[in-house]
Amino acid sequence: MLQARLSRFQIFVVLLALLATSCSLGARAPQMTSTLIVGNSHIDVTVDDGKLNVPQADLIAWAQAAAESVASYYGRFPVPHVSLRIMPFSGHGVRHGMTFGMRGGFIKIGLGSDTTKAALMNDWMLTHEMIHLAFPSVADEHHWIEEGISTYVEPIARIRASHMKEEQMWADLIRDMPKGQPEAGDQGLDRTHTWGRTYWGGALFCFDADVEIRRQTQNKKGLQDALRGILNAGGNITEDWELTKALKVADQATGTTVLTDLYNQMKDKPVSVDLQEKWKQLGIEWDGSAVHLRDDAPQAAIRRAITGAASPAGSNADASIQSAANAIAVMAGRKSS
């Protein structure tokens, strides 16, 4: 099923060697620049000068895997063009990702000098940032919906593209979803701007909506259809929309009023979600060390539909690196001077 979906936006890696130009403030620092073509979209990848232990092939494969994941969920890459700036720093890991609507889409993200190939292919942050491209910019009090969508959709998108295992996603959600529950003094999602409510409160909203949309439509529609509806109506990060407009468009795509109704419940008052009951209905059991998925649970079909039951991760991630490495060997980029 994944192969058929991806064939419509086959990802080609095109590496372009570019020369940096001088400006009135002096010559720019050396940079490595390459371009990914994802369907009809271009991703210009610029790596700032600095020490990295991974070769260019692995950086391109990392960007490709993230773009592949996002395209698998939305049916296409969200914007025609985005610039991705990778900024090396001393240390390990991926940090400080930020996404902007300027120039058609711009992402900057930090990468530690000691980061390994394996760590890159297990990274979630770049996929999270690319998902931001697929939702319109809304007022600051609604920042929770922007972060919530990226937090919730990211693992699903990676599973759909075979870059993550389903069991890992549910284990992570069992651990992290409670961080989104309202605490004492909470005034609703629009009025409570803590880290937990912004990221995990937003994710909790998305999760609750996804299950309810699927319940009301007999599993024919889900949050994915709602978010694709927004994107297909022109709602990407370069556009400024009222949140109520985005939710109305999303509801029209599913033939329900789930998102608008849930927003009206949660926007200005604390609403807790019975997560233990959700896990039970979906057939998700945690034994203290691992997740077990029960197919005899009442909503097991909804659980399977949410993730798309993609094949286990591993081999495809390695294949992405090998594919990018082969392309680089043929069309090697070089540092601009």
Ranges and model annotations:
Residues 20-31:
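Bacterial Sec-dependent signal peptides at the C-terminal "C-region" and cleavage site
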Residues 53-65, 116-121, 125, 140, ...:
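Soluble non-cytosolic domains of exported or imported proteins
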Residues 32-138, 142:
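Juxtacatalytic substrate-recognition/specificity segment
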Residues 10-22:
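Bacterial N-terminal signal peptides
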Residues 1-6:
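N-terminal secretory signal peptides that target proteins for export/translocation
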Residues 68-76, 132-135, 155-159, 210-218, ...:
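Sec-exported extracytoplasmic/periplasmic mature domains
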Residues 141-210, 215-217, 223, 228, ...:
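Acidic/His/Gly-enriched intrinsically disordered linker/tail segments
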Residues 235-337:
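Beta/coil-rich, acidic/histidine-enriched accessory regions frequently appended to metallopeptidases
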